[in-house]
Amino acid sequence: MPIIVDKEKMRMDILLAFQRCIEKKPIDKVTLRDIAGEAGMSHPKLLNYFENKDALVLSYVKYTREFMTKHCMEWFETHSRKEYESNLAYMNAFMKYVADAPEGELRPNATTQTYILGHYNDEIGKMIREEFKEWRSVMEGCLRSIYDGDIGREEAEAMMILISGTFICNYNGALTGEINDNIIGNIANLAES
């Protein structure tokens, strides 16, 4: 009797192997053979799931979009604004979550490398722009629910810039972590000065 293979699970295993490869060397230097080896399969077997590296990268960008959207929504759904003394405290708590991933949350940390690829590959670039559009829309909805509709697209986009910058700095180990519990408060200090 033939073994039944969960194709989606295999694809996810390959995407996670791709992510591990990217932690070892730049995305443009990672080959399908590297990924297959990391996934514990042959190169021809990997090609049953992804026809080429671009298809794999596009799937990774899609995975990233879905992951970020889902986790952002979950954070806001499980953290009531009423539990915090102010909007500033609430948004600082969210940014602390962004800066300090909870243990066991396997974030797609190679996302920042795909942002660069998007500049050189139109299809990947389009997918990344769609990722940001969806993510911004989700953020706008979350912010509107907190601020009773007084917040719009611009504030959501500002949060996207802040979140993306935090991810990029974390990926490179550039943050000290000393301000992770008051990121927005420190930005507010600039506006008040």
Where are these regions (language model features)?
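Hydrophobic alpha-helical connector segments
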Residues: S59, M73-E105, A156-M159, D181
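N-terminal intrinsically disordered/low-complexity leader segments
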Residues: M1-K9
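Amphipathic alpha-helical packing segments from all-alpha helical-bundle domains
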Residues: E103-T112, H119-Y147, E157
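Residues in soluble alpha-helical coiled-coils and helical-bundle/repeat scaffolds
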Residues: V5, E51-A55, R81, A99-E103, ...
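Helix-turn-helix
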Residues: D13, A17, C21-A55, S59
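Solvent-exposed, amphipathic alpha-helical segments
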Residues: D13, A17-K24, H71-E74, A110, ...
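Hydrophobic/aromatic-rich alpha-helical bundle segments in the mid-to-C-terminal region
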Residues: G125-R129, S145-A191
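Short, basic, alpha-helical segments at the C-terminal edge of helix-turn-helix-like DNA-binding modules
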Residues: K62-T69
